[in-house]
Amino acid sequence: MNILVTGAKGMVGTALVNNLKNIRDGKNRTRNIEINEIYEYDLDSTEAELDEYCAKADFVFNLAGVNRPENPDDFMKGNFGFASQLLDTLKKHNNKAGIMLSSSVQATLAGRFGNSEYGRSKKAGEELFFEYGKETGAPVYVYRFVNLMGHSRPKYNSAISTFCWAVANDEEFTVNDRSTELEVLYIDDLVEGMFDLLEGKEQHCEFDGVETVLDENGRYCCVPVTHKATLGEIVDLLEEFKSQPISLMMPKCPDGSFAKKLFSLYLTYLPTDKFKYAMKMNCDDRGSFTELVHTVDCGQVSINISKPGITKGQHWHNSKWEQFIVVHGHGLIQERNINTGETVEFEVSGDNIEAIYM
């Protein structure tokens, strides 16, 4: 399969292209997708390149568009005008490849989006694609995305990116209303949704105002995994992430949670001098003890270094339990029943790593 990605250097395009390359190069074998060529088209590409790519593509992701033009009239030129050029070029080559359009929930023109010039331009692009599908028989997949959360330029089009950058870089920022709620789609979930599309497993939907309603016969497509959070909740999480190297407290980030995705995004904004941070080594004549990570509900991880011939321990706890793992050197671990005096012992070595319950 040859895949054309327009807007390939944008936030979504960059993430999608990088992940498509992982599949093409055999680094991601979790998907049933065979990729030969990935054609990357962006503002610095030529019409000749677009012509070549449209002749050869087996599937097209149209991510190109504008969202912050200096002149509002450029919304229609950037979002509708290029879409027309792309579809005309595909028609020229009689290429009926499937094509995906990246649209926006603003195209509903519902609620606060009723007067959105951006929404009108996206709506016009949608109708153009649907008409193209009727005219040519080519499969058309229109996605109306909510706020996207991924690594992008701060102070531009994403409050979350701006907050991540500001907190990570100790910059001042303003939250106008902590109660404002955002519905966001994380970039990794979007990419997985595009892989589902390539495998013929896309989700269809309709819209009730700005709300997505799953419908297997729906006109639109969607990535159903979104998250809702207030600006206050987002900023509080970011401040917690920032304090982690000091408190050592690992934030609660269950698999698939908004917190886990936000933490992953936050780390992409760290300046390089914050990639490394010091740990406090508590040293004495016996060796050292260093706490690495604390968790809210799963205890902590630490490193205990003992000098040769040193005995540590000689105490007990009521409910606390530990696992000792020797990763270097040799040692003898002895556990004693305080009621009977019975002792069991385990010889341990970094040459054969084992865990011992205490």
Residue ranges with predicted function:
Residues 196, 200-281:
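Mid/C-terminal beta-alpha module of Rossmann-like enzyme folds, strongest
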Residues 318-338:
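Glycine- and acidic-residue-biased ligand/ion/polar-headgroup-sensing regions
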Residues 43-85, 89-92, 106-113:
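NAD(P)H-binding glycine-rich loop region in Rossmannoid oxidoreductase-like domains
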Residues 84-126, 133-136, 141:
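Conserved Rossmann-fold NAD(P)-dependent oxidoreductase catalytic core, especially the SDR/UDP-sugar
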Residues 130-142, 146-182, 187-200:
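NAD(P)-dependent short-chain dehydrogenase/reductase
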Residues 273-314, 320:
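A short glycine-rich, His/Asp/Glu-containing loop-to-beta-strand
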Residues 2-26:
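N-terminal Rossmann NAD(P)H-binding glycine-rich loop of SDR-like oxidoreductase domains
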Residues 337-358:
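Short acidic-glycine-tyrosine-enriched beta hairpin
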